[in-house]
Amino acid sequence: MYSARRRGQQMHNPWFWHRTVVTRWLPMMALPLLTSVPAAWPQPEPALPPLSSEQVVQHLMEKNLERAAALQHYVGKRSYRLEYHGFPASAEATMEVEVNYDAPASKHFTIVSATGSKLIQTRVFHRLLETEEQAGDASNRKQTELGSENYTFSLAGTEGPNYVLNVEPKVESKFLYRGKIWVDGHDFAVTRIEAQPAKSPSFWTTKSMIHHTYQRVDNEFYLPKENKTITSVRLGGTATLTIEYQSYQVTAAKPLALARKPVPSAVGFAWPDGGSNQEVANFMSSRR
């Protein structure tokens, strides 16, 4: 009777439950977990081949040309947002845009909706679209291409599946940048950019930081995912321009193997939305 009553008391004793679970049941419960843990651990990524910066850039140029020659048409959506906080007053605006791309470098934009500051819409967003439409011209592309004619490259190291390269412009131009690029070690495509303009686009801006990321589309093409530019204003204030790229649909493309071409002196890859810093600077100057 005593032992039964004692067992009943133990059943309602939190410490008894704690001791019983910890000493008896947890080891048994943990056994199947422990035996399955090694299979669940993430496997280390294979080390990248030890390539020089020249070799990485050469592969990048070749693959960019293949992808550019293969990509014939796509559609997509973009969300533009600019937030300015500072002197003389804060302002913000957004715009939703649809884009149609046709090879080799033609883009057509349709504005779906817009909210906020009319000044930002006209002085920044509209001009960004106009600049990008004009960027398809061969002479304009040549000024901004990420290649040996415009940049000097050096290997900074590796990070996961990417080679990391330092990029230095050969001339001080507001259309060129200095910073780092991340190049996928398998596809040899730019996946990320962290940089700043080689030359300030305006007296009114003191510093701009550019953050670009890219996404793989249809397992073959690398297209922009997000573009964020943070600009500091000389008289106080910060402007943050964010462009998000969504809903890509590649509607026409050639097989990459059939798109191979000889490598020219410059790679077929330009910094996306290269006029963003200039248009933000124009907006700043209009508020003085």
Please identify what each model-predicted range represents.
Residues 2, 34-35, 285:
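Intrinsically disordered, low-complexity segments enriched in Ser/Pro/Gly/Ala and basic residues
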Residues 43-178, 185-191, 198-207, 218-221, ...:
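Structured extracytoplasmic
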Residues 193, 225-229:
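Beta-strand-dense domains in secreted/periplasmic systems and polymorphic toxin scaffolds
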Residues 1-23:
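N-terminal secretory signal peptides that target proteins for export/translocation
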Residues 25-36:
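Bacterial N-terminal signal peptides
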Residues 38-42:
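Sec/Tat signal peptide C-region and signal peptidase I cleavage site
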